[in-house]
From Swiss-Prot:
Residues of the PH domain: 473-572
Domain DH: 236-433
Subunit description: Interacts with YWHAZ/14-3-3 zeta; when phosphorylated at Ser-886. Interacts with the kinases PAK4, AURKA and MAPK1. Interacts with RHOA and RAC1. Interacts with NOD1. Interacts (via the N- terminal zinc finger) with CAPN6 (via domain II). Found in a complex composed at least of ARHGEF2, NOD2 and RIPK2. Interacts with RIPK2; the interaction mediates tyrosine phosphorylation of RIPK2 by Src kinase CSK. Interacts with RIPK1 and RIPK3. Interacts with DYNLT1.
Post-translational modification as stated in the protein's UniProt record: Phosphorylation of Ser-886 by PAK1 induces binding to protein YWHAZ, promoting its relocation to microtubules and the inhibition of its activity. Phosphorylated by AURKA and CDK1 during mitosis, which negatively regulates its activity. Phosphorylation by MAPK1 or MAPK3 increases nucleotide exchange activity. Phosphorylation by PAK4 releases GEF-H1 from the microtubules. Phosphorylated on serine, threonine and tyrosine residues in a RIPK2-dependent manner.
Cell location: Cytoplasm, Cytoskeleton; Cytoplasm; Cell junction, Tight junction; Golgi apparatus
CDD domains membership: C1_ARHGEF2 (cd20877), PH_ARHGEF2 (cd13393), RhoGEF (cd00160)
Protein name as annotated: Rho guanine nucleotide exchange factor 2
Pfam families: PH_16, RhoGEF
PANTHER family: AGAP007712-PA, RHO GUANINE NUCLEOTIDE EXCHANGE FACTOR 2
Annotated positions of the Phosphotyrosine modification: 894
Species assigned in the record: Canis lupus familiaris (Dog)
Comp. bias intervals (Acidic residues): 941-950
Biased composition regions of type Basic and acidic residues, renumbered to the chain: 920-939
Recorded coiled-coil stretches: 591-612, 798-867
Length: 986
């Protein structure tokens, strides 16, 4: 039993060992399968910290890494899935496929052994032009074994149209098998042939110069014996000039790599869209042309400065002229446009590159293979874009260093200073353009994120939609907190634009105008910005129309200072509402675009005329220099074509100057006494109105004859062609002066043409209102009428179209004038209706006052008949105060009342009252009651008079007709009270 148990136990242990070994083998197989990815057989190794990952180009800091012994690739464990297929496995598969294809073709190979075998490059490479441009020197050597391939041209030459169908099918299968090559393999074979060869072909034009500038500095590039002969200042200056040329050469190399290697490979090998490639490399062709030309000029100047018999030793003494020509004029404008576009799209280009690199494996493989070489390792796409962006910022530093170490002539230093100023101006313009382009792109982004139905009501202006944003320029934007009337804070996006402040609020990933208690569009007209006391982040925005105050808060104190500064600057330069309306209709927008196009055409016309006059003057000066031996003529005034400057001449002054030049030219050609009164009807005979006779155009006032037989004889003909003044100084020849006057006349006439064009555009763009417009229309109509009275003449079709356009424009102007007159008539009719209503009210008030006056006169008449005044002695007669009499109606008393004037010789007031009533019966009755002036006596005991003397105030007329009505009852009570004591006394 023990033996049986031992055997059983041994057998059990044996089975367990086999099971454990099988499990270990399965684990090893699973681990091996897990390491096997994309044809790579990865194994685990331990590496140092200096080993770089092939996939991500980063150092492998972990203790373990993966390596493929087939292709010797070391990567991170996490990067194995991103690695491309193993190249050795691909080559084995490719050789097997080609061997199979060649075996199938051997049965139908009809090519003779004497015929040389050709390489079917069109069937192998998908882009023949790219291979020819980059690998022309290596065309005879193939990277793949094609010894058993067939020439399609030779095969086709041995088969006619009557060949069997089976042979043709075999031929098509063989050629299709060659065309089925993967595009990624084509890229690999391209780069495997050597990036050095590609680079050498790219820089073939500057190969010699690149070797000459391989040293780090000028001191190391020249011979030591030649270096010891130079001064220290010259050595420093030449080092900087050498650095300028060397960095320019490197910059051209970077541009060529971007243009010829990356862009061409992406277009022809990867078959990317042209728009995508243009987004990666914007304006590289323009930049390459600009800097290649500049580098050629620098290298030519270096060759001119070489010492005789040497190819290394040189000293450049003159460089400022090249710098001025490069950074001024058309060249500077080209650089400004190219760098503005490139730098503004720098961020988008890098973002697009990262997206392509992350999602496209073929793109990853292309970039890795290109940058594998040592010469291109530091020239990836991102590095090249960054280098091109930073290049323009290096010029001011280099030129400033050259200027600091220049101790030569003053002219060179002055030119270097000018060049430095031009470079700084160019850099400032590029920065401004980049800022504007970035703000424009930001505005487009905001516009596309806005809700199309979003509108903000503007008081008395209408709705403000998102289309109004595109009319303006975005100056500044940012997120702020808007404090509402309830004390809550709302997150808003504030846009500072040309003439408005716009508040936007984000809702459902779209921008809308916030529906709050205040308008979300604020005009910059008379806008006031104030800081909030005791708050570092708050500020007030006080608007005038409508009068509102906004309280907003920024993220920091610096942001508030920035907002205050930019808002105040925008308020100072805010355009008026006449030039830039708040809300623009479609018709107004169309007219504005037309005006802008007209202004651009005027600028282009002025520029063309300026260039034309300059060429004419240059040609004339060249002819004069040849004839007179180097005598240069003065140039035209600089402000002739400057329409924006204050030196811009007016059309009238230009015309007067042109007439003066014509008269001077006439005096030079035919003499000062000849009157050129030629008419187109009879140019030979001219009648002098003073003498009544005929005068020939060749006879002067002194009777001297002039002959014009195809040439010009000047009025002063001396035996000696040279003329001298009284002091013996040489005078200018008449021919030179005539040519100079001709140049002046030519420039003045073209300047007049430019001024007239600009004036027409200005008058059409800004039509005056009222009589000036009617006068303009009348002048236009009179010109048309005079042109019509000249007589019928054949009119060209383009002229008919022009006249039709003019008539249509005049018709539109007349219609606009008619509408304006109608609006004016409606306003006048409304005013007339208001005046008529006021007139009716005044007539009613006048009738009421007349009725009250009649009633008062009737009461006075009744009172006078019932109570006659008692007879008194002359000494007891007292003068009546104006208040004690029956007062007439309100208007009559107000117009006739004269306050009493104090007399100098008496202590009492002389109450002489003069009453002029508009009612004649009332005035007669008043005279009867008061009596004659001789019978009036002064009453010094009147208490009312005494009170008036004590008061000393002037009597003021009543304020309203109601006061007059209330005062009419006063005289009756006074007379009744005065009558009682009179009766008692009597």
């Amino acid at each position: 039993m023990s033996r049986i148990e031992s055997l059983t136990r041994a057998r059990t242990e044996r089975s367990r060992e086999l099971a454990s070994k099988n499990r270990e083998k399965e684990k090893m197989k699973e681990a091996k399968d897990a390491r096997y990815t994309n044809g790579h057989l990865f194994t685990t190794i331990s590496v140092s910290g200096m080993t770089m990952c092939y996939a991500c180009n980063k150092s492998i800091t972990a203790k373990e890494a993966l390596i493929c012994p087939t292709c010797n690739v070391t990567i991170h464990n996490r990067c194995k899935d991103t690695l491309a297929n193993c190249t050795k496995v691909k080559q084995k598969q490719q050789k097997a496929a080609l061997l199979k294809n060649s075996t199938a073709l051997q049965s139908v190979s009809l090519r003779s052994k004497t015929t040389p075998r050709e390489r079917p490059s069109s069937a192998i490479y998908p882009s023949d032009s790219f291979r020819q441009s980059l690998l022309g020197s290596r065309r005879g050597r193939s990277s793949l074994s094609l010894a058993k391939s067939v020439s399609t041209t030779n095969i086709a030459g041995h088969f006619s149209d009557e060949s069997p169908l089976g042979l043709r099918r075999i031929l098509s299968q063989s050629t299709d098998s060659l065309n089925m090559r993967n595009r990624a393999l084509s890229v690999e074979s391209l780069i495997d042939e050597g990036a050095e060869v590609i680079y050498s072909e790219l820089m073939s034009d500057f190969e010699t110069d690149e070797r000459d500038f391989a040293a780090d500095s000028w001191s190391l590039a020249v011979d030591s014996s030649f270096l010891q002969q130079q001064k220290k200042e010259v050595m420093k200056q030449q080092d900087v000039i050498y650095e300028l040329i060397q960095t320019e050469l490197h910059h051209v190399r970077t541009l060529k790599i971007m243009t010829r290697l990356f862009r061409t490979g992406m277009l022809e090998e990867l078959q990317l869209e042209p728009g995508v490639v243009q987004g990666l490399f914007p304006c590289v062709d323009e930049l390459s042309d600009i800097h290649t030309r500049f580098l050629s000029q620098l290298l030519e100047r270096r060759r001119q400065a070489l010492c005789p018999g040497s190819t290394r030793n040189f000293v450049i003494h003159r460089l400022a002229d090249l710098l001025i020509s490069q950074f001024s004029g058309p060249s500077a404008e080209r650089m400004r446009k190219a760098y503005s576009e490139f730098c503004s799209r720098h961020t988008k280009a890098l973002k697009l590159y990262k997206e392509l690199y992350a999602r496209d494996k073929r793109f990853q493989q292309f970039i890795r293979k290109v940058t594998r070489s040592a010469v291109l390792k530091r020239h990836g796409v991102q590095e090249c874009i960054l280098l091109v962006t930073q290049r323009i910022t290096k010029y001011p530093v280099l030129i400033n260093r050259i200027l600091q170490h220049s101790h030569g002539t003053d002219e060179e230093r002055q030119d270097l200073t000018t060049a430095l100023g031009l470079v700084k101006e160019l850099l400032s313009n590029v920065d401004q353009d980049v800022h504007e382009l970035e703000k424009g792109a930001r505005l487009q982004e905001i516009y596309h994120r806005m809700d199309p139905r979003a509108q903000a009501p503007v008081p008395s202006k209408g709705p403000f939609g998102r289309e109004e944003l595109l009319r303006r320029k975005l100056i500044h934007d940012g997120c702020l907190l808007w404090k509402t009337a309830t004390g809550r804070f709302k997150d808003v996006l504030m846009l500072l634009m040309t003439d408005v402040l716009v508040f936007l609020q984000e809702k459902d990933q779209k921008y809308i105008f916030p529906a709050l208690d205040k308008p979300s569009v604020v005009s910059l007209q008379n806008l006031i910005v104030r800081d909030i006391a005791n708050q570092e982040k708050g500020m007030f925005l006080i608007s005038a129309a409508p009068p509102e105050m906004y309280e907003v808060h920024t993220a920091s104190r610096d942001d508030r200072s920035t907002w205050v500064r930019v808002i105040q600057q925008s308020v100072r330069v805010c355009p008026s509402r006449e030039d830039f309306p708040l809300i623009e209709t479609e018709d107004e927008a169309y007219l504005r675009r037309i005006k802008m196009e007209l202004q651009q055409k005027d600028k282009a016309l002025v520029e063309l005329l300026r260039e034309k006059v300059g060429l004419f003057a240059e040609m004339t000066h060249f002819q004069v220099e040849e004839d007179s031996g180097g005598v240069a003529l003065p140039a035209l005034p600089r402000g002739l074509f400057r329409s924006e400057s204050l030196e811009c001449p007016r059309g009238e002054r230009l015309l007067q100057d042109a007439i003066r030049e014509v008269e001077g030219l006439k005096d030079l050609l035919v003499g000062p006494g000849v009157e050129l009164l030629l008419t187109p009807r009879d140019p030979a005979l001219l009648v002098d109105p003073d003498s009544g006779g005929s005068t020939s155009p060749g006879v002067t006032a002194n009777g001297e004859a002039r002959n014009f037989n195809g040439s010009i004889e000047l009025c002063r003909t001396d035996s000696d062609s040279s003329q001298k003044d009284r002091n013996g100084n040489q005078l200018r020849a008449p021919q030179e002066e005539a040519l100079q006057r001709l140049v002046n006349l030519y420039g003045l006439l073209h300047g007049l043409q430019a001024a007239v064009a600009q004036q027409d555009t200005l008058m059409e763009a800004r039509f005056p209102e009222g009589p000036e417009r009617r006068e303009k229309l009348a002048r236009a109509n009179s010109r048309d009428g005079e042109a019509g009275r000249v007589g019928p003449a054949p009119v060209a079709p383009d002229k008919q179209a022009t006249e039709l356009a003019l008539l249509q424009r005049q018709h539109a102007l007349l219609q606009e004038e008619l509408r304006r007159c109608r609006r004016l008539g409606e306003e006048r009719a409304t005013e007339a209706g208001n005046l008529e209503a006021r007139l009716r009210e005044s007539e009613q008030a006048r009738a009421l006052l007349e009725r009250e006056a009649e009633e008062a006169r009737r009461q006075l008449a009744i009172l006078g008949q019932s109570e006659p005044p008692p007879a008194e002695a002359p000494w007891a007669r007292r003068p009546l105060d104006p208040r004690r009499r029956s007062l007439p109606a309100g208007d009559a008393l107000y117009l006739s009342f004269t306050p009493p004037q104090p007399s100098r010789g008496h202590d009492r007031l002389d109450l002489s009252v003069t009453i002029r009533s508009v009612h004649r019966p009332f005035e007669d009755r008043e005279r009867q009651e008061l009596g004659s002036p001789e019978e009036r006596l002064q009453d010094s005991s009147d208490p009312d008079t005494g009170s008036e003397e004590e008061g000393g105030g002037r009597l003021s007329p009543p304020h309203s007709p109601r006061d007059f009505t209330r005062m009419q009852d006063i005289p009756e009570e006074t007379e009744s009270r005065d009558g009682e004591p009179m009766v008692s006394e009597s």
